[in-house]
Regions:
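Charged, amphipathic alpha-helical coiled-coil/dimerization segments
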Residues: 72-129
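Helix-turn-helix DNA-binding motif, specifically the short coil turn and the N-cap/start of the second
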Residues: 63-66, 70
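N-terminal leader segment of winged-helix/HTH proteins
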Residues: 1-32
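N-terminal helix-turn-helix DNA-binding core of bacterial DNA-binding proteins
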Residues: 24-63
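N-terminal positioning helix adjacent to the helix-turn-helix/winged-helix DNA-binding module
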Residues: 7-10, 37, 99, 126
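Terminal interaction helix/tail motif
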Residues: 3-5, 109-150
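Short, locally clustered residues in the helix-turn-helix/winged-helix DNA-binding domain
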Residues: 43-47, 108, 135
Length: 150
């Protein structure tokens, strides 16, 4: 197998395995009422100040309309709270409830463990090389996504 085939196989397997492992790790009995996509919306909202819908939609790469559907479900399930901006009542702000903050931390801990496991045993040069390669991959996806939108 040449380098191209190896990289292609690794990328496909990694993508599928990360999605599978993330789903099994995140959707525990406590969080069985939400999906991995819901967890990503929760992550995008974050635990700081409330965010407007456009900001969250951009962070998860969906339209505001698509996000509205997800937010409606998360509000009903008690993970997200929706309010109006005091400055501009037309602006809808979303923030995490206590239940949502717990889910956020659960997701954050999973990612911390995943990253630490990947970096464990790598020397500084290997860590730098991996970081550089992953940034190039991210740049490809960012530019590919931007071409698709135009």
């Amino acid at each position: 197998m040449n380098s191209y085939e190896t990289v292609n196989d690794v990328l496909v397997k990694l993508f599928n395995e990360i999605m599978d492992v993330e789903e099994r790790a995140l959707i525990t009995s406590e969080y069985k009422d939400i999906s991995v996509n819901d967890m990503h919306v929760i992550e995008a909202i974050g635990i700081r100040e409330p965010k407007n819908m456009s900001t969250v939609a951009r962070a998860v790469s969906v339209t505001v309309g698509t996000l509205t559907i997800a937010i409606n479900h998360l509000v009903k399930k008690g993970y997200v709270e929706r309010t109006r901006s005091e400055e501009d009542r037309r602006v809808v702000l979303v923030s995490l409830s206590e239940k949502g903050e717990k889910a956020f931390l659960h997701h954050k801990i999973f990612h911390e463990k995943m990253v630490m496991t990947v970096l464990d045993g790598l020397n500084p040069k290997e860590t730098e090389d991996l970081t550089r390669a992953l940034l190039k991959l991210q740049n490809f996806f960012d530019s590919y996504g931007n071409k698709e939108k135009n």
